[in-house]
């Protein structure tokens, strides 16, 4: 019994440290919800591949500019490509633009925005942060469908984002090879209204959910 007690005390102490650390991390995250949009301010430590990125604070972007960015996000099915579709319809972009504008102004140094938008077709989830000349959009889920683009086809591919004028994919270099990440868009901060007239997701049949 005398041997067990110190061991139990040590295990309890370690568990308490991890619990307190986890609570502190959660306490740092602030969440706001309105009109189906939920925004969380998260630490930059949660992002990957941003070591050489210089973030911009404060983030002052006009409502019209954010609306242009939302309307310029298009996606396409990988296995059975069809005409690209809007991630956000015009009505949704107009509704969300002022919310993103307000939220971005509230981002403090060392933070970025994680967002989810819940609609009748499912959940759309992503991250957004701003650098000197660009807005970075990382989309993980569209209408409830998780992004998958495995070149080895171990997991069935789903969709990819489609670039428009003023946008580029993020590229990662690992082991001498460069990889294009097609669910991450880097867009000029002063992106104009999109010229492409792709149909919105409200008028185009969506691909089956995985």
Where in this protein do the model-derived segments appear?
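Post-signal peptide N-terminal segment of mature Sec-exported envelope proteins
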Residues: 30-58
């Amino acid at each position: 019994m005398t041997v067990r007690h110190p061991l139990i005390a040590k295990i309890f102490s370690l568990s308490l440290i991890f619990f307190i650390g986890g609570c502190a991390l959660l306490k740092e995250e602030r969440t706001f919800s309105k009109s189906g949009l939920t925004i969380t301010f998260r630490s930059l430590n949660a992002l990957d591949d941003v070591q050489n990125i210089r973030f911009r604070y404060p983030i002052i972007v006009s409502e019209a500019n954010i609306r242009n960015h939302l309307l310029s996000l298009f996606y396409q099915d990988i296995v059975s490509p069809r005409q690209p579709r809007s991630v956000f319809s015009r009505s949704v972009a107009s509704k969300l633009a002022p919310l993103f504008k307000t939220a971005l102004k509230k981002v403090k140094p060392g933070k970025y925005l994680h967002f989810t938008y819940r609609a009748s077709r499912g959940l759309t989830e992503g991250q957004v942060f701003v650098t000197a000349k660009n807005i970075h959009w990382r989309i993980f889920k569209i209408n409830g469908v998780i992004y998958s683009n495995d070149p080895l086809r171990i997991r069935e591919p789903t969709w990819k984002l489609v670039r428009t004028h003023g946008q580029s994919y993020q590229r990662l270099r690992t082991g001498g090879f460069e990889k294009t990440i097609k669910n991450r868009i880097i867009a000029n901060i002063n992106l104009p209204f999109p010229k492409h007239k792709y149909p919105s997701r409200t008028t185009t049949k969506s691909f089956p959910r995985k």
